[in-house]
């Protein structure tokens, strides 16, 4: 596989956008420090009003302290964040599905699940959980589940009866290694196990929130989510009169729904309020559509070697894409608009905790594969 390490590549690209760091503002509280071994004249200990000059001096001092603290605080490092999260997610995925009887189906599941990939969905899930006050353990099972379902969708999407692709993540597709029959079953098994894994392996979360997360995930991949988008996409292939509204329906459901669910699951399992969950839902819907717009752009501007999958396939099968409807430059402008709108939804959250989601949105916008 070409991926020099996809995580390193991803981080390097993101760091070019951010100059490797993101800064935040921080606010320090005031501490009262008692004077030890000091004798105070009672007459001088009487409360007296502050003069305007004294108040101004104190305010200036505290402002200087805040500025100094902000300058000395360690900035967010996206490369470190991505590397650490990817290691954690890959370890959890490896441990979740082990090879047992029947060997061939578990090997096929692991082949595609552990074949690399950017792990965007798991990272979004974990980042959203931590943003609302949860910890990684609360959402790790869900993060693995969304990656299992994403992998299922790729296995099925690559089948001869669908997109008929031979290359995925720089390697032969699942059906090229294990045959169409086993590939279908491997995808089915990943889908079923994803829900089992959330229920059995989620730690430190109330049952009601786990049930809510399961319902959210199920909805995102059924006839109100991924399946709806996939069916609409199939019906529109080869149709020269597909409208922009129809194209948006396809991608909001086919691509954005699972990305949206990844973020919402993290927010639910992290203990987020209804208001926080809905703000993050809007954020995720924007970056989900952004992901597809960028995908369409890359399909016509990059090679198969650069993408790790077959390039130019959309043009060959006459599939409607954003560059086809809008033109390449307008598609790029639309991507930038979606990125801006996504970030607006994060206003009001703690800036330090929101930094990973801001960085992930920028990665999606500026990625090269």
UniProtKB/Swiss-Prot annotation:
Q: Which Pfam families match?
A: polyprenyl_synt (PF00348)
Q: What class of enzyme is it?
A: transferase
Catalytic activity, as annotated: isopentenyl diphosphate + dimethylallyl diphosphate = (2E)-geranyl diphosphate + diphosphate; isopentenyl diphosphate + (2E)-geranyl diphosphate = (2E,6E)-farnesyl diphosphate + diphosphate; isopentenyl diphosphate + (2E,6E)-farnesyl diphosphate = (2E,6E,10E)-geranylgeranyl diphosphate + diphosphate
Which residues participate in isopentenyl diphosphate binding?
A: 118, 121, 150, 169
Q: Where does Mg(2+) 2 bind?
A: 157, 163
Q: How is the cofactor bound?
A: Binds 2 Mg(2+) ions per subunit.
What this chain does, per the entry, is described as:
Catalyzes the trans-addition of the three molecules of IPP onto DMAPP to form geranylgeranyl pyrophosphate.
**Descriptive protein name:** Geranylgeranyl pyrophosphate synthase, chloroplastic
Q: What gene, per UniProt, encodes this protein?
A: GGPS1
């Amino acid at each position: 596989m070409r991926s020099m390490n996809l995580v390193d590549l991803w981080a390097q690209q993101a760091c070019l956008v951010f100059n490797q760091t993101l800064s935040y503002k921080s606010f320090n509280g005031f501490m009262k420090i008692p004077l030890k071994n000091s004798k105070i004249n009672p007459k001088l200990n009487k409360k007296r009003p502050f003069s305007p000059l004294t108040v101004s001096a104190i305010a200036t001092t505290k402002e200087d302290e805040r500025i100094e603290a902000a300058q000395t605080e360690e900035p967010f490092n996206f490369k470190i964040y991505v590397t650490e999260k990817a290691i954690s997610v890959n370890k959890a995925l490896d441990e979740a599905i082990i090879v047992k009887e029947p060997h061939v189906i578990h090997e096929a599941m692991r082949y595609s699940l552990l074949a690399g990939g950017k792990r965007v969905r798991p990272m979004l899930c974990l980042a959203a959980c931590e943003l609302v006050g949860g910890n990684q353990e609360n959402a790790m099972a869900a993060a693995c589940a969304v990656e299992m379902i994403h992998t299922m969708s790729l296995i099925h999407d690559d089948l001869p009866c669908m997109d008929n692709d031979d290359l995925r993540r720089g390697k032969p597709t699942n059906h090229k290694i294990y045959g169409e029959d086993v590939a279908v079953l491997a995808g089915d098994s990943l889908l079923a196990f994803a829900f089992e894994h959330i229920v059995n392996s989620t730690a430190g979360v109330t049952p009601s929130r786990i049930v809510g997360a399961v319902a959210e995930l199920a909805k995102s991949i059924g006839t109100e989510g991924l399946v709806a988008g996939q069916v609409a996409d199939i019906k529109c292939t080869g149709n020269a009169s597909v409208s922009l509204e129809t194209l948006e329906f396809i991608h909001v459901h086919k691509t954005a729904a699972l990305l949206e669910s990844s973020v919402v699951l993290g927010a639910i399992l992290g203990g987020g309020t209804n208001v926080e969950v809905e703000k993050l839902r809007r954020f995720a819907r924007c970056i989900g559509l952004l992901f597809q717009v960028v995908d369409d752009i890359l399909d016509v501007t990059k090679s198969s070697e650069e993408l790790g999958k077959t390039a130019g396939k959309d043009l060959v099968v006459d599939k409607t894409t954003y560059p086809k409807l809008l033109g390449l430059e307008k598609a790029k402008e639309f991507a930038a608009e979606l990125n801006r709108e996504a970030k607006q939804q994060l206003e009001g959250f703690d800036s330090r905790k929101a930094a990973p989601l801001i960085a992930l949105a920028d990665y999606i916008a500026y990625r090269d594969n």
